[in-house]
Curated annotation (Swiss-Prot):
One GO biological process term: fatty acid beta-oxidation
Catalysed transformations (reactions): an acyl-CoA + acetyl-CoA = a 3-oxoacyl-CoA + CoA
General function of this protein: Catalyzes the final step of fatty acid oxidation in which acetyl-CoA is released and the CoA ester of a fatty acid two carbons shorter is formed.
UniProt source species: Shigella boydii serotype 4 (strain Sb227)
Organism lineage: Bacteria, Pseudomonadati, Pseudomonadota, Gammaproteobacteria, Enterobacterales
Protein name in the entry: 3-ketoacyl-CoA thiolase
Oligomeric form and interacting partners: Heterotetramer of two alpha chains (FadJ) and two beta chains (FadI).
Keywords: Acyltransferase, Cytoplasm, Fatty acid metabolism, Lipid degradation, Lipid metabolism, Transferase
Length: 436
């Protein structure tokens, strides 16, 4: 066991997570069509503060993230402060770590708490796959800049004459890695082939995810942590996530064609997480501040770790790299965990990470560790389903996972929970949570 790094303030206070909330998650171009991420962020933070009944002046910092950036609102965090009735003097800044963005937001607020610069803050994220920054071609962009500087009409017309019809076509946001040109689905396919993850195994995990998510809603387990969203034209509120298949059937998964490697692939739209709209946030404060306010924390942040690996192969192994670090810093092992919640970007990626967590060879030859991180107990793993079922509003996923895991830990009488995710760019995140 390496060095344990306690997450406490100078006064010995633990980092308490006192409340968490999310919007229902909606598939792209459905219930939240036309609602930008900044409005989703305002929605969830406003409701979170209203439910918590914490005075606005208590919150000293808001760190929020957005992966699909909107040029008109580059600092989503500050816009949320100004749009929710929070104290205008509240410090607010935005972060981005791809799919681990709200993990980063939580870590940043925790670091401010440990440094003693604040005693309470909000962390979270929001994304919309339905409101996208549709751009223009590089050639058109250059011409438009030059036209703005041209002094005469003839100069402007001459510049426009350089354009061809194809230069006028809109350019959607890139879905491939900037550095490699590879899509995440391409990497998931590569991992499936390299580590022997079959189509049947992937479909089975997706089916399991939908079944468990549907059961969680049916049992009423998510009502406390998911708000009802009222959206224009305010005729029909969104109460639950709309991606979950309540009648999920393995036979239906087998009918779908591969989405990335059309001839020999196993990754499909059904065993991958869908493009999603939504927002999530958590309130963190020092343990003593929570006691002063008479608040009972959902739980505590025990440790966290971020890692980075090469992007050309196995880019989505973030959990396999970050989990042992987070456990080490918490002074725990896999067997000490009550719950394990891993972001299901793709069933192939999830199953490959599970495989490597239990691999002695990977631990010794790649991580330089004496032993494997540990086998993942299926009875502890994604017990309420995962991203394949709920969806994945990129920047919101971490805050949602933290909130859901803490609520489930409390239902089970407390214990330790691991939340972990891969992210674009070869990044990984893991956090160990504790509930009493």
């Amino acid at each position: 066991m390496g060095q344990v790094l306690p997450l406490v303030t100078r006064q010995g206070d633990r980092i308490a997570i006192v409340s968490g909330l999310r919007t229902p998650f909606a598939r792209q171009a459905t219930a939240f069509h036309g609602i930008p991420a900044v409005d989703l962020g305002k929605m969830v933070v406003g409701e979170l503060l209203a439910r918590s009944e914490i005075p606005a002046e208590v919150i000293e910092q808001l760190v929020f993230g957005q992966v699909v950036q909107m040029p008109e609102a580059p600092n989503i965090a500050r816009e949320i402060v100004l749009g929710t009735g929070m104290n205008v003097h509240t410090d607010a800044y935005s972060v981005s770590r791809a799919c681990a963005t709200s993990f980063q937001a939580v870590a940043n607020v925790a670091e401010s708490l440990m440094a003693g610069t604040i005693r309470a803050g909000i962390a979270g994220g929001a994304d919309s796959s339905s409101v996208l920054p549709i751009g223009v071609s590089k050639k058109l962009a250059r011409v438009l800049v030059d036209v703005n500087k041209a002094r005469t009409m003839s100069q402007r017309l001459k510049l426009f004459s350089r354009l061809r019809l194809r230069d006028l076509m809109p350019v959607p946001p890139a879905v491939a890695e900037y550095s490699t040109g590879l899509r995440m689905g391409d990497t998931a396919e590569q991992m499936a082939k390299t580590y022997g993850i079959t189509r049947e195994q992937q479909d089975a995990l997706a089916h399991r995810s939908h079944q468990r998510a549907a059961q969680a809603w049916s049992d009423g387990k998510l009502k406390e942590e998911v708000m009802t969203a009222f959206i224009p034209p305010y005729k029909q509120p969104l109460v639950e996530d709309n991606n979950i298949r309540g009648n999920s059937s393995l036979a239906d998964y087998a009918k779908l064609r591969p989405a990335f490697d059309r001839k020999h692939g196993t990754v499909t739209a059904a065993n991958s997480t869908p493009l999603t709209d939504g927002a999530a946030a958590v309130i963190l404060m020092t343990e003593s501040r929570a006691k002063e306010l008479g608040l009972v924390p959902l739980g505590y942040l025990r440790s966290y770790a971020f890692t980075a690996i090469d992007v050309w192969q196995d880019m989505l192994f973030g959990p396999a790299w970050s989990t042992p670090l987070a456990l080490e810093r918490a002074g725990l092992t896999m067997s000490d965990l009550t719950l394990i919640d891993m972001h299901e970007a793709f069933a192939a990626q999830t199953l490959a990470n599970i495989q490597l967590l239990g691999s002695e060879r990977f631990a010794c030859e790649v991580l330089g560790r004496a032993h494997a991180t540990g086998e993942v107990d299926d009875s502890k793993f994604n017990v309420l389903g995962g991203s394949i079922a709920y969806g994945h509003p990129f920047a919101a996923t971490g805050a949602w996972m933290i909130t859901q895991t803490l609520h489930e830990l409390r239902r089970r009488g407390g214990g330790f929970g691991l939340v972990t995710a891969c992210a674009a760019g070869g990044l990984g995140a893991a956090m160990v949570l504790e509930a009493e």
